[in-house]
């Protein structure tokens, strides 16, 4: 009998010359006999030699020959025979030949046939056979690692290869959303083969299956693969210890370079800590890479993870005694990071929220003995961390620090009073507090909460029995009979007293100087009445206010908080704004000078900034009390009212106006446009005094005094001042002084552009936008072209590299605004 190599060589030579369909069929059948699948199959030794040495060259020859000449000879039966070479031989070699042929072949009959065969190859589940074959080969003494790497690359990126080859003619089977779930099913089949082999006492290797999982996840397809793989593994490991060991080995064998995407996907997919513990086992203790990912990187850096994933990770650490020491270690590291001043200052808010969530989840999972061992760390972190968060200029960060500090103090001393802060609760604060309870406790509470209304519903109340309802009807009839005999007032409508106010014994002062005396006194009732009417009185008596404007502003700025006076802070702010609007030059000079003076609290300095911005806005608006003579406003002067109190017969009548009104009322109009009164022009009062508000405030910011350091610890006030300067700049639109103010503000921004506080940087970016909106583009490019170019470069850098989301957004807005202004100028030469 001729050797296999000779037979194969002769068959290939004949096939290359055949032009008859029947001879082609006979030649193919003679080659197929070596596959060992037909009736006339060759001996086992010959089949093994053919598969090892000749199978791949034969497939490559068949792919090369398929074309217009062979297509005329191949009927449907012969095409099926051609396909069987790929579908019935060694799957790993057939898969590689098909994938390589697709990459080398352009649009042609050959490409269509290869795609068709590959589609059938996947539909019959041959991927599982490919993976299993490679797993078996890895048990050999000299596995072909290069071949395995090639198969691994083709399996993990098959949708990308097919999309590049077929482009718009791609098949739905090759789409990622369809392929990777099918691949997950193939991996489950391979694991089932491993389970069966282990039960038969055979050796197995699943490292190649682990490599497939790792590489697919590394390419960003965790969701498609693990959404099928994790639920199937969850159901299998719960009932079988062999499956549990297979699952653990599957994840242990994932290469370290691909471990991160695999663990991240499993953490996000696994529904709870119990499932995660069943899938991973003690992998976090055995594998250093896994321990680093689960206890450091995911908890400190990957702040895109949701709170459910964090609860799964930390709950997984707490579910077994061999892992609980890692939970205590994580708590100490979280406390150190949370209390770090550098972290609070330089980290974005989402990352701080992420660390705070992890910290509170840890606290909720520790028992009393573990918390007792960490009490000193808790105390040190509380004392240093609370201060750093309270010093933050970002309100959300301050509020978050308050919540965590309250929880830490409660765990340090459960029986003591603990810390308590005043803050407005929002969704984040409520979520943080809820994290102290493990997930199963939260679910129980919510379930009870849902059940309570059902238990107390009217349908299940004892009052719904027929006897009780009958008794209640009799009682109602008796009550109605007794009430009918009485002369009651039940039908009277009660008087509406919702708008009533409490009568005050003290009257509101009529003069400004009287108000000053009341403000300096200790009479709380008079003070309340005076504060309620002070702003209105200032607006009505402008001349008298200007005489004592500085004294009044000084008293209002220094007056102590009066909790007994309703809306005291709001009324004081309104009065300060009113006196500043009445005498803007004098009061603004006083306030800006006092802003940098000694012995003022941060609250007073921020009050000054609020008053300056509110007063500037009021000055830039049209005065509400200025109306035209035709507006029909009522004169409230009592003398004028008495002098004009004529009888109806003495009132002079404008007969022309009466006639026009009668004609208008009798006239029927089918269409009438909107009649709008022509606005009365009025000067912008702020433009004339803008410099008195702006320049004194901007010139002394770098001067350090004993109790006030804007460039140091008082960055919250610096941020508020920067925003105030931006508001003052924005209100100078169309003002002659706008260019001068804009140049000074750009220089100010350039000095502070590298400030570490995100709130300050947000204010600086806001100032740039106000300069662009207030100063004409022509003046910007002529008077301060160099500053504008430097500012544009800085905006681009911030938009690309800044750690704060709001800063990046404001920088992009500034760049878009700058580009829009430039295009408007170029479009209108």
Curated annotation (Swiss-Prot):
One of its GO terms (cellular component) is cytoplasm. Residues 456-466 have a biased composition (Low complexity). Residues 629-641 have a biased composition (Polar residues). Residues 482-493 have a biased composition (Acidic residues). Belongs to the TEL2 family. Regulator of the DNA damage response (DDR). Part of the TTT complex that is required to stabilize protein levels of the phosphatidylinositol 3-kinase-related protein kinase (PIKK) family proteins. Promotes assembly, stabilizes and maintains the activity of TORC complexes, which regulate cell growth and survival in response to nutrient and hormonal signals. May be involved in telomere length regulation. This is Telomere length regulation protein TEL2 homolog.
């Amino acid at each position: 009998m001729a050797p296999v190599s000779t037979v194969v060589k002769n068959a290939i030579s004949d096939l290359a010359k055949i032009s008859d369909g029947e001879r082609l069929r006979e030649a193919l059948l003679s080659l197929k006999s070596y596959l060992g699948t037909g009736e006339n199959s060759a001996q086992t030794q010959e089949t093994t030699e053919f598969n090892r040495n000749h199978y791949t060259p034969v497939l490559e020859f068949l792919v090369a020959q398929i074309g217009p000449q062979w297509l005329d000879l191949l009927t449907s039966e012969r095409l099926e025979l051609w396909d069987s070479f790929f579908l019935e031989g060694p799957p790993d070699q057939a898969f590689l030949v098909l994938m390589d042929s697709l990459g080398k072949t352009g649009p042609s009959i050959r490409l269509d046939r290869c795609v068709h065969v590959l589609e059938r190859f996947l539909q019959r589940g041959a991927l599982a056979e490919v993976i299993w074959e490679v797993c078996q080969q890895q048990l050999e003494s000299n596995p072909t690692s290069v071949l395995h790497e090639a198969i691994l690359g083709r399996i993990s990126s098959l949708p990308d290869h097919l999309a590049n080859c077929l482009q718009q003619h791609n098949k739905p089977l090759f789409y990622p959303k369809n392929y990777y779930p099918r691949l997950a099913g193939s991996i489950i089949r391979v694991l089932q083969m491993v389970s069966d082999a282990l039960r038969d006492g055979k050796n197995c290797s699943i490292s190649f299956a682990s490599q497939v999982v790792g590489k697919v996840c590394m390419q960003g397809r965790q969701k498609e693969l693990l959404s099928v793989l994790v639920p199937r593994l969850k159901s299998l490991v719960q009932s079988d210890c062999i499956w549990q060991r297979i699952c653990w080995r599957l994840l242990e064998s994932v290469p370290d370079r691909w471990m991160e995407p695999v663990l991240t996907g499993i953490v996000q997919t696994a529904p709870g800590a119990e499932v995660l513990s069943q899938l991973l086992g003690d992998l976090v203790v055995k594998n250093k890479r896994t321990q680093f990912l689960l206890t450091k990187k995911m908890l400190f850096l990957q702040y895109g993870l949701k709170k459910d994933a964090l609860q799964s990770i930390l709950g997984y650490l707490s579910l077994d005694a061999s892992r609980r020491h890692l939970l205590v270690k994580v708590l100490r590291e979280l406390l150190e990071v949370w209390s770090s001043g550098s972290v609070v200052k330089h980290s974005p808010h989402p990352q701080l929220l992420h660390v705070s969530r992890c910290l509170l989840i840890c606290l909720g999972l520790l028992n009393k003995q573990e918390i007792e061992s960490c009490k000193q760390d808790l105390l040190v972190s509380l004392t240093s961390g609370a201060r750093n968060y309270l010093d933050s200029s970002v309100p959300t960060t301050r509020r978050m620090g308050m919540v965590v500090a309250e929880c830490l103090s409660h765990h340090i001393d459960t029986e003591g009073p603990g810390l308590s802060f005043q803050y407005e609760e929002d969704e984040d604060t409520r979520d943080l507090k809820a994290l102290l309870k493990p997930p199963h406790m939260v679910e129980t509470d919510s379930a009870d909460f849902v059940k309570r209304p059902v238990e107390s519903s009217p349908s299940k109340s004892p009052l719904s029995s027929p006897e009780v309802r009958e008794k209640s009807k009799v009682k109602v009839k008796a009550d109605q009979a007794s009430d009918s005999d009485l002369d009651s007032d039940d039908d009277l409508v009660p008087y509406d007293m919702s708008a009533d106010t409490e009568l005050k014994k003290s009257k509101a002062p009529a003069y400004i100087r009287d108000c000053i005396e009341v403000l300096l006194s200790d009479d709380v009732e008079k003070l309340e009445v005076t504060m309620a009417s002070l702003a209105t009185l200032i607006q009505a008596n402008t001349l008298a206010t200007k005489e004592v404007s500085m004294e009044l502003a000084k008293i209002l700025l220094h007056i102590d908080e009066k909790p007994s006076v309703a809306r005291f802070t709001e009324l004081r702010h309104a009065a300060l704004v009113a006196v500043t609007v009445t005498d803007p030059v004098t009061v603004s000079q006083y306030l800006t000078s006092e802003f940098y003076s000694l012995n003022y609290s941060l609250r007073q300095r921020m009050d000054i900034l609020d008053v300056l911005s509110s007063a500037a806005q009021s000055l830039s608006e049209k005065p509400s009390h200025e109306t035209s003579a035709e507006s029909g406003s009522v004169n409230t002067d009592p003398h004028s009212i008495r002098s004009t109190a004529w009888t109806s017969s003495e009132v002079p009548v404008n007969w022309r106006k009466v006639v026009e009104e009668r004609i208008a009322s009798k006239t029927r109009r089918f269409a009438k446009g909107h009649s709008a009164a022509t606005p009365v022009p009025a000067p912008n009062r702020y433009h004339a005094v803008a410099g008195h508000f702006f320049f004194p405030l901007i010139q002394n910011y770098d001067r350090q005094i004993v109790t006030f350091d804007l460039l140091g610890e008082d960055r919250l006030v610096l941020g508020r001042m920067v925003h105030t300067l931006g508001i003052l700049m924005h209100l100078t639109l169309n003002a002659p002084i706008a260019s001068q103010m804009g140049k000074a503000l750009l220089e100010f921004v350039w000095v502070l552009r590298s400030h570490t506080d995100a709130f300050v940087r947000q204010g600086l970016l806001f100032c740039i936008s106000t300069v662009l909106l207030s100063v004409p583009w022509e003046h910007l490019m002529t008077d301060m072209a160099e500053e504008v170019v430097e500012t544009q470069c800085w905006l681009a850098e911030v938009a690309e590299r800044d750690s704060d989301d709001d800063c990046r957004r404001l920088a992009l807005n500034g760049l878009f605004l700058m580009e829009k202004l430039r295009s408007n100028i170029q479009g209108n030469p």
